[in-house]
């Protein structure tokens, strides 16, 4: 008998929570649909999406049509490459700035960062998803390394120069991967 009396409050609690949970779920769905309607209206300039009371099915149909049309558009490879190069360039400049700001950085860390940067190709090489070509000169980086025979003392990145001295190449090493 005691077991059934303990179950009753739990069932009552669940019954009270169920409408609240359902209400929150519906609010989330409606908020997301409204954001989607606004996005589609701004993107497609469709008059039927102008009305905030448009049916949910209409919003979903417009979304499907929009996604299908985006899939059929030809990919502007040049624009994608340019955007990738821009992002890569920004990351490279940030890395160089970080390395310049840390004179006490571990030599191994500098060696690994320099190795990663040295694998970059020049603009005349083909585009690579691993490393985009550099399109502009990056400020030079100078530091004294604890392993001067591995990395040059002065590193300058430009489209015509490499990152390491000609007396040493990293071809004898495997490519370093942080997850291996």
From Swiss-Prot:
Residues 13-70 form the bHLH domain. GO terms for cellular component: nucleus. One of its GO terms (biological process) is negative regulation of transcription by RNA polymerase II. Residues 84-116 form the Orange domain. A motif (WRPW motif) lies at residues 176-179. Gene3D superfamilies: Helix-loop-helix DNA-binding domain. Expressed in the presumptive midbrain-hindbrain boundary (MHB) as early as the early gastrula stage (stage 10.5). Expression in the MHB continues through to tailbud stage. Also transiently expressed in the eye anlage at late neurula stage. Changing residue 23 to A: Reduces MHB gene expression in a dominant negative manner. Its main location: nucleus. SMART domains: HLH (SM00353). InterPro entries: bHLH_dom, HES-7_bHLH-O, HES_HEY, HLH_DNA-bd_sf, Orange_dom. GO terms for molecular function: protein dimerization activity; RNA polymerase II cis-regulatory region sequence-specific DNA binding. It is found in: Nucleus. It comes from the Eukaryota. The keyword Nucleotidyltransferase does not apply. Transcriptional repressor. Represses transcription from both N box- and E box-containing promoters. Demarcates the prospective midbrain-hindbrain boundary (MHB) region in the neuroectoderm in early gastrulae embryos by repressing transcription of a number of target genes. Transcription repression requires formation of a complex with a corepressor protein of the Groucho/TLE family. This is Transcription factor HES-7.1-A.
């Amino acid at each position: 008998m005691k077991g059934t009396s303990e179950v009753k409050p739990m069932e009552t609690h669940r019954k009270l929570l169920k409408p609240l949970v359902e209400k929150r779920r519906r609010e989330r769905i409606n908020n997301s649909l409204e954001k989607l309607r606004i996005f589609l209206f701004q993107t497609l300039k469709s008059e039927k999406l102008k009305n905030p009371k448009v049916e949910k099915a209409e919003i979903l149909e417009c979304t499907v049509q929009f996604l299908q049309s985006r899939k059929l558009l030809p990919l502007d490879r040049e624009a994608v490459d340019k955007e990738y190069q821009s992002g890569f360039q920004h990351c490279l400049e940030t890395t160089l700035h970080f390395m310049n700001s840390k004179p006490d950085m571990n030599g191994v860390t500098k060696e690994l960062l320099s190795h990663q940067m040295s694998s970059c190709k020049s603009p005349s090489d083909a585009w690579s998803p691993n490393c985009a070509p550099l399109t502009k000169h990056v400020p030079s980086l100078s530091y004294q390394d604890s392993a001067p025979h591995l990395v040059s003392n002065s590193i300058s990145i430009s489209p015509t120069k490499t990152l390491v001295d000609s007396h040493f190449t990293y071809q004898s090493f495997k490519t370093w991967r942080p997850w291996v």
